[in-house]
Amino acid sequence: MSKKCQVTGKKPITGHNVSHANNKTKRRFLPNIRTVRVTLPDGTKKKIKVSAKGLRILKKKNFQVDL
């Protein structure tokens, strides 16, 4: 399953977990992705994966969003 926002293009990035002893282990920072149903201007409905920021963008552009 893809972890990429279809509106903003956000995707996972890599980094480290850092312990108190300063040991580092690799980890992934995942975007906050949700599947929502969007009503397009022509009246059709489509399911897309969006991040929290992408959801705000869709609402500001007056798309009908069903969670």
Swiss-Prot record:
It comes from the Bacteria. GO terms for cellular component: ribonucleoprotein complex; ribosome. One of its GO terms (biological process) is translation. The lineage of its organism: Bacteria, Pseudomonadati, Campylobacterota, Epsilonproteobacteria, Nautiliales. This is Large ribosomal subunit protein bL28. Keywords: Ribonucleoprotein, Ribosomal protein. InterPro entries: Bacterial_rp_bL28, Ribosomal_bL28, Ribosomal_bL28/bL31-like_sf, Ribosomal_bL28_bact-type, Ribosomal_bL28_sf. Belongs to the bacterial ribosomal protein bL28 family. The keyword Ribonucleoprotein applies. GO terms for molecular function: structural constituent of ribosome. Gene3D superfamilies: Ribosomal protein L28/L24 (2.30.170.40). The gene is rpmB.
